[in-house]
C-alpha cells in the first residue's frame, strides 16, 4: 500500500512537471523550427518567456525568413518585437522586396514599421503603383467662368522617403493647388475644356512629389465640367453694393435738404415775427410823431391813402393769380 501511494505521488509530480514544461516551454514550436531547419535552442525559447516575449510571434516569422533565404537572427526579430514592431509584417515585406529585386535591409524595414508606416503595403506599391483619385477641384479662368476638374494620380511608393515623408493628403493638396493655378492662368475657359491635358502636363512639371513618400508617375484628368459664372456674380454683387451706396448717399442728401428746409422755414417765421413786431410799433410811432408835431394831419392822410392803395393792389394781384390758377386747372 505505501508503494502504491509513492508511485501515485511520483506520477503526479511527473505529470505536473510535464504540464509546467509544455506550458512554459513551447516544445511544439521548437520541434517545428527544427523541422524547418531553423537552429534555435530550447533555452532560447525559455528566455523569450522570461523576457515576456511570445515565442510564436518571433519563431514563425523566422521560419518564413529562413525558407525565403533571408539572413535574419532571432535577436533582431526579438528586439523589433520588444520595440513594439510588427515582426510578421516586416518579414513579409522583406520577402516581397527580395522577390521584386528591391534593395531593402532589415534595419530600414524595421525603422519604417516603427514609424507607423505599412511597410508591406509600401513594398507592394513600389511594384504595383497606386491610383489616387481627387475630388472635384474648382478653379476660375480669367474670363470669370468656374471650371471643375477631377484628377487621377498614379503614384509609386518611395521607400527611401517613407520615414519623414508626407502622405497621400499632401499629394492631393499639392495637385489640387496646381490644378487651380493652371486653370486660373488660362485666358479662356474654352481652352481648358479643349485641352485638359495641358493641366496634367503643367502640374506634373512642378515636381509636386518633393518631400513626400511617393513618386508621382502620371496625373490624368478624369473629368472636367463647367461651374458657375463667378465673374458675372462678382460684377452683380459689386453693382448691388454700388447701388446701395448711392441710395445711402441720396438718402443722406435728402435728409440734409429736409433739415435745411426746416431751418429756412424757421428763419422765415422768425423774420415774420420781427415784421409783425415792427408793424405793431408803427401806430405808436405815428401817434408820437403827431403829438410832437413832426407829422401833420395831411401827411397822416397821405399815409392812409398809400396804405389803402397798397392793400388794393395786393387784393387785385391775389385775385388775378387765383383766376390764372383756375384756368390752368380747367385746361
UniProtKB/Swiss-Prot annotation:
It is a multi-pass membrane protein. InterPro entries: FloA. It holds the Pfam family FloA. Keywords: Cell membrane, Membrane, Transmembrane, Transmembrane helix. It is found in: Cell membrane; Membrane raft. Belongs to the flotillin-like FloA family. NCBIfam families: PRK13665.1 (NF010186). Found in functional membrane microdomains (FMM) that may be equivalent to eukaryotic membrane rafts. FMMs are highly dynamic and increase in number as cells age. Flotillins are thought to be important factors in membrane fluidity. This is Flotillin-like protein FloA. The gene is floA.
